[in-house]
Amino acid sequence: MSKLDLNALNELPKVDRILALAETNAELEKLDAEGRVAWALDNLPGEYVLSSSFGIQAAVSLHLVNQIRPDIPVILTDTGYLFPETYRFIDELTDKLKLNLKVYRATESAAWQEARYGKLWEQGVEGIEKYNDINKVEPMNRALKELNAQTWFAGLRREQSGSRANLPVLAIQRGVFKVLPIIDWDNRTIYQYLQKHGLKYHPLWDEGYLSVGDTHTTRKWEPGMSEEETRFFGLKRECGLHEG
């Protein structure tokens, strides 16, 4: 696999970019997660960043990437509505893994947004998308720009939802390379990695949560529900960060 030219790829239409990366992705599918990270660091341009929501299985990608690239900036987009357990989990993992945490937030406070727009998350898909644009997408775009990111690592997995089922290891999103080292991992592999390295699930895992985001759009799993149905009232799976 040869080095890739980000500027040249960004000039191509989306379909042509996918085709241009197809051969590389076929080779990346053969590598393990550590091999994918190492390949990206050797062949893709810096600066490098890792995003995390500090969700249920966040410790895996945080540990995996950080042990290969210590001090990599870890981007958290904080809506101000995370669970108290999530904020404690952030502190715990930041200390344990010595993370170089970079927290980004919306330019307007949560209180300002509610006063102006009401509770956007109660306003159907359109309201949820506007909420996500303000609190997730814009802060992430700002983070990528301020950190001069050209390669972005994330912990998405195909098993998590239908919208992620066909994602490749390597893509281009928001004008930068996006690498998904554990895209093909199943829940058993996640568990084994956590056990091997003395890591924990998010605290709410033990209370029946399969996925954790904001307090107002996250539901505890109940029999018959898919993981997707525990987020955004089942109307959406993605918060906007991993779309487009």
UniProtKB/Swiss-Prot annotation:
GO MF annotation list: phosphoadenylyl-sulfate reductase (thioredoxin) activity
Enzyme class: oxidoreductase
Compartment annotation: Cytoplasm
Keywords noted in UniProt: Cytoplasm, Oxidoreductase
Domain of life, source organism: Bacteria
A single GO cellular-component term on record: cytoplasm
Enzyme Commission identifier(s): 1.8.4.8
Active site: C239 (nucleophile)
UniProt keyword Ligase present: no
GO biological process per UniProt: hydrogen sulfide biosynthetic process; sulfate assimilation, phosphoadenylyl sulfate reduction by phosphoadenylyl-sulfate reductase (thioredoxin)
Coiled-coil parts of chain: none
Protein's pathway: Sulfur metabolism; hydrogen sulfide biosynthesis; sulfite from sulfate: step 3/3
Keyword Oxidoreductase carried by entry: yes
NCBIfam families: cysH (TIGR00434), PAPS_reductase (TIGR02057), PRK02090.1 (NF002537)
Function: Catalyzes the formation of sulfite from phosphoadenosine 5'-phosphosulfate (PAPS) using thioredoxin as an electron donor.
Family: Belongs to the PAPS reductase family. CysH subfamily.
Full protein name: Phosphoadenosine 5'-phosphosulfate reductase
